[in-house]
A protein has these predicted regions:
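Active-site beta->alpha loop and helix N-cap motifs at the rims of alpha/beta catalytic domains
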Residues: 30-34, 52-163, 167-170
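Low-complexity, intrinsically disordered or signal/transmembrane-proximal segments
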Residues: 13-15, 26
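Conserved, mostly hydrophobic/aromatic
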Residues: 48, 62, 94, 123, ...
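Catalytic alpha/beta core domains of metabolic enzymes, predominantly
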Residues: 171-268
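C-terminal alpha-helical cap/extension of soluble enzyme domains
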Residues: 35-41, 65-67, 76, 227, ...
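Cationic, low-complexity basic patches in intrinsically disordered or flexible, solvent-exposed regions
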Residues: 4, 8, 14
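N-terminal amphipathic alpha-helix/helix-capping segment at the start of soluble metabolic enzymes
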Residues: 26-53
Length: 328
């Protein structure tokens, strides 16, 4: 094992980390998605129309902040309330504006296998770097049905694909064994696990290939997920504090556990409060208060309830103060 230390200039901060970590990172063909990937909101005007100028500013914000990649039109991007044409228009705009300055992961999951194939093929045609595919929701497929669903998508469209298991939204929980079988398919490169169950990551580390990306989708348990062997996350919190969260994630991945936990302690209440109501309601309000987007959100989702607005606003003030006082 290489024991020498290297100094990495990361987002304007000097970090001393193990050289072996960075060597292993760049040997992983999927290294572009290691660290903090943002589950980007879709900014909207009050009438629900997409605000593409605000979207441009958000893309620049994440490029400047060192975010690993952007997920376009996932759950946080309100994929459930955009039509197919608009869905693809948002992906197209994001890919073109990003212009290879940051990788773009397109949300292309559906509970119809044929629709998921169509969306994934279109996303590839538009130039997305990878696709995020949620487990089919509402129709509750069997475990073998899940395997056949993702297998056919992978065989039909030659683009890197990331599985997405979020049983709290889909009413189906993909087993570790099915994930491990799917991990053997070359263009299925990873999974976003949003179960919040740390026993899952412990099993995935053992059963999946070493270069299979293990990404958390649960901000509240992210640091422990990374310490257990995860490679990064697709984050809601990263919408608001991308630079800070990237520091947390890379510290944890590199094995600097004390630093990661110390940094994350400043964000713990915020992670939880961003789910006071259904995502993306609170995070959109937070970004609105930061001046980064209008208040627009689409029915059946509504603007954040008045009783929670002050909580989010206080979180923003506290995070800003705590990070300014940090010695990092």
């Amino acid at each position: 094992m290489i024991k020498s230390l290297v100094e990495l200039l990361l987002l304007g901060q000097s970090y001393i980390i193990s050289a072996i970590f960075w060597i292993n990172l760049y040997m992983n063909k999927n290294h572009s998605f290691i660290g903090s990937n943002v589950a980007l909101i879709t900014p909207m005007f009050a009438d629900g129309a997409v605000d593409y100028e605000a979207l441009n500013l958000l893309i620049d914000f994440h490029i400047d902040s060192g975010t690993s990649s952007i997920v376009s039109v996932g759950t946080t991007g309100e994929s459930a309330t955009v039509g197919v044409k608009e869905h693809l228009k948002i992906i197209n705009h994001t890919v073109k504006y990003a212009a290879k300055r940051i990788p773009i992961i397109a949300g292309t999951g559906a509970n119809s296998t044929s629709e998921a194939i169509e969306l994934t093929q279109e996303a590839k045609n538009l130039g997305a770097d990878a696709c995020l595919l949620v487990t089919p929701y509402y129709n509750k497929p069997t475990q073998e049905g899940l395997f056949q669903h993702f297998k056919l998508i992978a065989e039909s469209v030659n683009i890197d694909q990331i599985l997405y298991n979020v049983p709290g939204r889909t009413a189906v929980d993909m087993s570790v064994d099915i994930t491990a079988r799917l991990a053997e398919i070359p263009n299925i490169i990873g999974i976003k696990d949003a179960t919040g169950d740390l026993s899952v990551i412990e099993q995935l580390v053992v059963k999946c290939p070493e270069n299979f990306l293990l990404l958390t989708g649960d901000d509240a348990t992210a640091v422990d997920f990374l310490i257990a062997g995860g490679h990064g996350g697709i984050s809601v919190t990263a919408n608001v504090v991308p630079k800070e969260l990237q520091k947390v994630y890379l510290s944890a991945i590199a094995g600097n556990i004390e630093l990661a936990k110390n940094l994350n302690s400043k964000l713990e209440s915020f992670h939880k409060n961003l789910f006071l109501e259904a995502n993306p309601i609170p995070v959109k309000w937070a970004l609105h208060k930061m001046g980064k987007c209008e208040k627009g959100i689409r029915l059946p989702l509504l603007e954040l309830s008045n009783e929670f607005k002050s909580i989010i606003e206080n979180d923003l003030k506290e995070i800003n103060l705590l990070w300014k006082l940090s010695i990092m």
